[in-house]
């Protein structure tokens, strides 16, 4: 009786991880950056380290094992794996992703916490001069770049003009 219950519990755990939004987001990013390689990588959620984001890079049963406490940590682990195990690079303007059909396995387990609760990115010049001309593909690349570099708080200027407007009204400026 205990064995079937244990098997059922394991099955629900596996199904739960497969449906977890952090895991799904991680695999989606991996497929966008390195199409077809996602099947060689296993993603797993772990608890934060003293309230900080954390990730681990290792291998398990012939697969690359990336662990993180959320989608950003998993994406950071993927980026660090690409850089330091595959000698690959993802940047704003292009990628250097020359690696073999079978991904190399990490030789040792790496565990890092990600510094800072909030990791801010972008500035008003980027938003005003550059991003205004981006299409969805370019935005997706930028969002992936942010996730792979631990960014969890991009500049959001949406609605800022309303704050400025109301502030000026409070200081007796008029619409004229």
Regions found by a protein language model. Name each.
Residues 39-43:
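A short, Trp-centered hydrophobic/proline-enriched beta-strand micro-motif
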Residues 29, 35, 46-50, 60-176:
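Feature activates predominantly on carbohydrate-active enzymes
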Residues 20-36:
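Short N-terminal segments immediately surrounding and downstream of signal-peptide cleavage
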Residues 52-56:
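Extreme N-terminal leader/anchor segments
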Residues 1-21:
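Bacterial Sec-dependent N-terminal signal peptides
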């Amino acid at each position: 009786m205990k064995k079937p219950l244990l098997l059922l519990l394991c099955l629900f755990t596996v199904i739960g991880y497969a449906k977890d939004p952090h895991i799904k987001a991680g695999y989606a990013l991996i497929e966008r950056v390195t199409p077809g390689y996602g099947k060689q990588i296993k993603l797993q959620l772990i608890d934060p380290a003293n309230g900080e984001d954390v990730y681990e890079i290792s291998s398990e049963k012939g697969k690359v094992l990336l662990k993180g406490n959320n989608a950003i940590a998993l994406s950071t682990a993927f980026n660090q794996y690409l850089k330091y195990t595959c000698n690959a690079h993802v940047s704003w303007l292009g990628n250097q992703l020359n690696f073999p059909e079978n991904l190399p396995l990490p030789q040792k387990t790496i565990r890092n916490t990600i510094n800072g609760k909030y990791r801010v990115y972008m500035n008003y010049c980027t938003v005003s001069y550059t991003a205004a001309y981006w299409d969805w593909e370019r935005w997706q690349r930028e969002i992936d770049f942010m996730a792979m570099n631990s960014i969890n708080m991009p500049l959001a200027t949406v609605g800022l003009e309303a704050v400025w407007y109301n502030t000026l009204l409070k200081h007796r400026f008029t619409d004229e």
